[in-house]
Amino acid sequence: TQRIRHKYSIKNVTGLNILPFVLYDDVFDIIAHCLVGSEGTLGFLSEATLETSHLYTHTASAMLYFKDISEACRCVVALKKSAPVFSCELLDRKSLESVNDTTGEGLTALLIDTKSDSEEGLEGNIKAIMDVVGQFELFNDAHFSTDPEETAGWWSLRSGIFPSVGGTRPLGSTAIIEDIA
């Protein structure tokens, strides 16, 4: 119980909330509070239908560094309009500092992922993305990788950012994260 209370006081949590197991004794209260989502919705699951995502056979990722966040954001807008980007994560200066990224000081990065069912399709996706990215000033050369170890390292870095940034905030404060389109 103390460990759960302590962890919740120092870390903002996304995903399943287990704090109700500590705060409430009544089973109904525990279940009701476990079903409260990040937007404050309460729900009851009586049935679920899962739709799986297509698993592409070819993927590539790139970690693109920009000198400032404004240029990175302009690039995101341009990519959204015309490039086959499967996912894109913006990592600001504080995020990169929190995971000890040593690429450069004060940078912003975009972690971009593209996918296809063929090698030719993937190459076409990368070319289309690079055509857009080429319109912007990067800190270093753009490099797409299909190497699973290299790309896993980038995505692992990204996964570690939220706990790292959350750990730098003052005790008792809340880190707010939201996905935007």
Language-model-derived ranges and their functions:
Residues 1-181:
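Noncatalytic alpha-helical scaffold of FAD-dependent oxidoreductases
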